[in-house]
């Protein structure tokens, strides 16, 4: 399995709604509101990089209120 951490920047006033919608996506293990330069952080697990890419492009980034994402893929040990 491939694990990734995703930082989300949301439009002002939409962070709570965005997090609620993100939690409903299959493959999202956790999603929390955070402090700092971003509004939320997700932990995602997918079978492979292709599935991760599809999840990010067709589901996550299409949620109303999502302005920007940064994805960090975990390096297996």
Residues covered by each model-derived region:
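A compositional/biophysical signature of low hydrophobicity enriched in polar/charged and small residues
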Residues: 1-77
